[in-house]
Amino acid sequence: MSFDINWSTLESDNRLNDLIRKHLNSYLQNTQLPSYVSNLRVLDFDLGKVGPAITLKEITDPLDEFYDSIREEADQETEENNDNKEDSEHICPDRTIANHEGPKDDFEAPVVMPSPNDIQFLLEVEYKGDLLVTIGADLVLNYPVEKFMTLPVKLSISDIGLHSLCIVACLSKQLFLSFLCDVSDPALDDNQTVLDPKGPILAATKPLERISIVRSMKIETEIGEQYQGQGSVLRSVGELEQFLFTIFKDFLRKELAWPSWINLDFNDGDE
């Protein structure tokens, strides 16, 4: 069973686009960069106007791992609250006698039990939309000496294609999303990932891995005209594009591919 989503609501949400951009930048800050690139950052993120095609395959109870995650988070919050409580007692010794009456004043972790309203969807997601990621970087030329020249470049990632199975679990006011595996798709399997229309071409991964999430994409690079004919610059640009393609795929697999997931917690809205 297929259904439509109101993609325009997400696409027009600047806060969501900015949140994703910040999350990507946080990941890049913890990524070891090669010697030929520095100051790698996401300048802009746009979900685009074309949403994914989604087909509902199955409805089940949520996986136990999601409940375990909520319990672990609740236990951690309880432990932190009790630690803060102990710190405040040390600061205010006049309250020590009252607080020694018993453990009744300690914070207790809430009991997490499955609810009849909890539900999980197995979805087939196909995306060939107009999402656009704009990235800035400094290309470092280390010849004839180290850091001989630094060249600012701007790269655009577009034409992203994916076709995967994923699970979406709704537990109380929390939503979990995780990708399970890729779906065979001739349009993507036979496609090529273009790193630069005038540069090298990297063929899409074959044979099909269990999960790549991103199966095709295009990266275009803008550099100053005075550098476009220099072989060393073009080689470095090609290496940078391949590096971006790799870390972009790795980011999605580490963050979204099972046994990893993203968790959207809407409980804070009650405060």
UniProtKB/Swiss-Prot annotation:
Q: Which BP terms from GO are recorded?
A: aminophospholipid transport; mitochondrial genome maintenance; mitochondrial outer membrane translocase complex assembly; mitochondrion inheritance; mitochondrion organization; mitochondrion-endoplasmic reticulum membrane tethering; peroxisome organization; phospholipid homeostasis
Q: Which PROSITE patterns match?
A: SMP
- Compartments where found: Mitochondrion outer membrane; Endoplasmic reticulum membrane
**Outcome reported for the amino acid change (mutating residue 19 to D):** Does not affect function
Q: What is the effect of changing residue 259 to A?
A: Does not affect function
Question: What happens after mutating residue 12 to A?
Answer: Does not affect function
Record keywords: Endoplasmic reticulum, Isopeptide bond, Lipid transport, Lipid-binding, Membrane, Mitochondrion, Mitochondrion outer membrane, Transport, Ubl conjugation
Matching entries from InterPro entries are given as:
Mdm12, SMP_LBD
**Which molecular function terms from Gene Ontology are attached?**
lipid binding; lipid transfer activity
Site of covalent link Glycyl lysine isopeptide (Lys-Gly) (interchain with G-Cter in ubiquitin): 49
Residue ranges constituting the SMP-LTD domain according to the UniProt record: 1-267
Keyword Transport among record annotations: yes
Q: Does the keyword Transport apply?
A: yes
Task: Kindly list any coiled-coil regions of this protein.
Answer: none
The reported effect of residue 20 to D is: Does not affect function
Record function comment:
Component of the ERMES/MDM complex, which serves as a molecular tether to connect the endoplasmic reticulum and mitochondria. Components of this complex are involved in the control of mitochondrial shape and protein biogenesis, and function in nonvesicular lipid trafficking between the ER and mitochondria. MDM12 is required for the interaction of the ER-resident membrane protein MMM1 and the outer mitochondrial membrane-resident beta-barrel protein MDM10.
Q: Which family does it belong to?
A: Belongs to the MDM12 family.
Subunit composition and interactions = Component of the ER-mitochondria encounter structure (ERMES) or MDM complex, composed of MMM1, MDM10, MDM12 and MDM34. A MMM1 homodimer associates with one molecule of MDM12 on each side in a pairwise head-to-tail manner, and the SMP-LTD domains of MMM1 and MDM12 generate a continuous hydrophobic tunnel for phospholipid trafficking. Interacts with PUF3.
Extra remark:
Present with 1070 molecules/cell in log phase SD medium.
What is the recorded name of this protein? Mitochondrial distribution and morphology protein 12
Originating species: Saccharomyces cerevisiae (strain ATCC 204508 / S288c)
